[in-house]
């Protein structure tokens, strides 16, 4: 099985863009890119796959990733790398790289996540990011000054990072949470969240959980789904 056949077997859909090298694969957070690459490495042990981001794989296999970008024919998180002419496929979650001049138009896409659930997927869709899920989860929006954090705290901007530090919270910045997954998360945002105020940092924070996410903002009405 070649990589294109594997993509299609995992519900990655071809776009109308004519194929050209490198073939670009875009997927929402939690769509299973790492599992896809591990499966391909199992089928094709000679595959040379590169990622610039440390991976936390649950696979019993040794990591399929090579340390050499120059020898890779598949590159994950490609906006972080300088691509050489021999690269066959490149992959990324494009929303994590909003505004990057290195984003390419995709030949394959997957808007379905296996990480979080319907409530978060519907919320992301309301923010303009088409997302689907196969399971339930819980999303709560509450006031940052009236609600205790639950699970891993992710502070999305300087104001909330300073607030978290003053309260001695064990928090992560969004960039520190890339490649990580938690059962429950609380994300701190210093402003109202809507399509106009959504940033890649907030998107990253919104997509780290498997069970529940609590969004804390100033003066937010308490809602849950």
From Swiss-Prot:
GO cellular component: host cell cytoplasm
Main location group: host cell
(+)RNA virus helicase C-terminal domain residues: 111-225
Subcellular location per the Swiss-Prot or TrEMBL entry: Host cytoplasm
Record keywords, A-Z: Host cytoplasm, Host-virus interaction, Inhibition of host innate immune response by virus, RNA-binding, Suppressor of RNA silencing, Transport, Viral immunoevasion, Viral movement protein
Pfam families: Viral_helicase1
One Gene Ontology term from the biological process aspect of the record: symbiont-mediated suppression of host innate immune response
Xref: InterPro entries: (+)RNA_virus_helicase_core_dom
Domain of life: Viruses
Presence of the UniProt keyword RNA-binding in the record: yes
Keyword set includes Signal: no
Residue stretches making up the (+)RNA virus helicase ATP-binding domain: 1-110
UniProt GO MF annotations: ATP binding; RNA binding
Note, other: TGBp1, TGBp2 and TGBp3 seem to act together for cell-to-cell propagation. TGBp1 is the main movement protein that physically cross the plasmodesma with the viral genome. TGBp2 and TGBp3 would facilitate TGBp1 function.
Subunit description: Homodimer and homooligomer. Interacts with capsid protein. Interacts with host AGO1; this interaction targets the host protein for degradation, thereby suppressing the antiviral RNA silencing.
Main function: Transports viral genome to neighboring plant cells directly through plasmosdesmata, without any budding. The movement protein allows efficient cell to cell propagation, by bypassing the host cell wall barrier. Increases plasmodesma size exclusion limit. Acts as a suppressor of RNA-mediated gene silencing, also known as post-transcriptional gene silencing (PTGS), a mechanism of plant viral defense that limits the accumulation of viral RNAs.
Entry similarity comment: Belongs to the Tymovirales TGBp1 protein family.
The name this protein goes by in its record: Movement and silencing protein TGBp1
């Amino acid at each position: 099985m070649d990589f294109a056949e594997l993509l299609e077997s995992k519900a990655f859909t071809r776009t109308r863009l004519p194929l050209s090298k490198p073939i670009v694969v875009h997927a929402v957070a939690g769509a299973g890119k790492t599992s896809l690459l591990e499966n391909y490495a199992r089928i094709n042990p000679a595959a040379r796959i590169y990622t610039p981001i440390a991976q936390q794989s649950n696979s019993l296999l040794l990591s399929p990733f090579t340390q050499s970008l120059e020898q890779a024919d598949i590159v994950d998180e490609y906006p972080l790398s300088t691509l050489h002419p021999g690269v066959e496929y490149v992959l990324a979650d494009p929303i994590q790289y909003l505004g990057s001049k290195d984003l390419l138009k995709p030949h394959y896409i997957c808007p379905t996540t296996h990480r979080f659930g319907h409530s978060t997927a519907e919320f992301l869709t309301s923010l303009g990011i088409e997302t689907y899920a196969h399971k339930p989860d819980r999303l709560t929006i509450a006031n940052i000054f009236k609600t205790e954090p639950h699970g891993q705290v992710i502070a999305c901007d300087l104001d909330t990072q300073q607030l978290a530090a003053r309260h001695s919270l064990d928090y992560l910045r969004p960039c520190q949470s890339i490649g990580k997954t938690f059962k429950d998360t609380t994300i701190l945002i210093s402003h109202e969240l809507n399509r106009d105020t959504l940033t890649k940092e907030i998107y990253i924070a919104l997509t780290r959980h498997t069970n529940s996410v609590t969004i804390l903002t100033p003066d937010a009405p308490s809602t849950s789904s």
